[in-house]
Regions:
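A flexible loop/linker signature enriched in serine peptidases of the S9 family
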Residues: 1-2, 72, 97
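Non-catalytic accessory segments flanking enzyme active sites
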Residues: 1-52, 78-81, 85, 174, ...
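Active-site-proximal cap/loop segments of hydrolase catalytic domains
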Residues: 92-218
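Conserved hydrophobic/aromatic pocket- or pore-lining residues that grip, position, or stack substrates
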Residues: 30, 40, 62, 83, ...
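Glycine/threonine-rich flexible loop motifs
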Residues: 69-75, 100
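Serine-hydrolase catalytic-loop signature spanning alpha/beta hydrolases and amidase-signature enzymes
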Residues: 66-70, 90
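Short amphipathic alpha-helix adjacent to the substrate-entry channel of hydrolases
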Residues: 74-94
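Short beta-strand element of the alpha/beta-hydrolase
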Residues: 44, 52-66
């Protein structure tokens, strides 16, 4: 203004977080085959106001990032802290195909989307169970977009998880290949196979066409 005076219109939120109630991630490396490993971040339950029974292992939520060639990091995530502060353990997976672990690691997803990402998330959950860190009878999975697709595949084609949440996930790969926007219209050629030549693979990996295998809450 002409007066050169500054007026404060809004103040930013000043919510504080008790550092002792923040669950800090532990990097984990999970064996997924004889010579291969997948990576993730494990968050144990943490809340200074409550203690779980020493005899009870916590339930687990496995998170699958989008992309699918994106990545998750150890940065503070309030959504993860929501669950860990309420008694859940969380495994945030960087399955094979994720960015940040070498070109060869990222290229492992080539032609294998809906397969090795699912295998790695299930392997991570089972590995934590074998370590005695989580309850194998109370394991769930969650993801959005490409991570939602991985979640649906895990719930449909694997019996590891008892429940899941797919946020705007993909159920029919053929529909995605034919109806998506132009910028990503050929993206699936590298992740699944060329369309329509590989149509059988698209159908085989689409949870929508195998709904009989989905027998848990979603």
């Amino acid at each position: 203004t002409e007066s050169r005076e500054i007026s404060i219109l809004y103040h930013s939120a000043s919510a504080s977080v008790d550092a002792n109630s923040v669950s800090c991630p532990t990097p984990v490396t999970v064996p997924v085959s004889e010579n291969e490993f997948a990576h993730g971040f494990f968050y144990p339950p943490q809340n200074t106001n409550f203690d779980g029974s020493p005899a009870d292992l916590p339930p687990l939520i496995v998170k699958s990032h989008g992309g699918p060639t994106g990545q998750t990091t150890a940065a503070f995530n309030v959504k993860i802290q929501y669950w860990t502060s309420r008694g859940f353990a969380v495994l945030d997976m960087n399955y094979r195909g994720s960015t940040g672990f070498s070109r060869a690691y990222r290229r492992r997803l080539k032609g294998a989307w809906g397969c090795i990402d699912v295998e790695d998330c299930a392997a991570g959950a089972r590995w934590l169970s074998n370590q005695g860190w989580v309850d194998p009878q109370r394991m769930a999975m969650s993801g959005g977009s490409a991570g939602g697709y991985t979640t649906l595949c895990a719930l449909t084609f694997d019996n590891c998880f008892s429940a899941g949440a797919s946020h705007y996930g993909i159920g029919d790969l053929s529909a995605l290949a034919t109806d998506t926007h132009k910028f990503e219209s050929r993206y699936l050629d590298g992740l699944i196979g060329p369309w329509p030549e590989a149509e059988a693979d698209y159908r085989a990996r689409s949870p929508l066409h195998h709904a009989e295998g989905l027998d848990c809450p979603v």
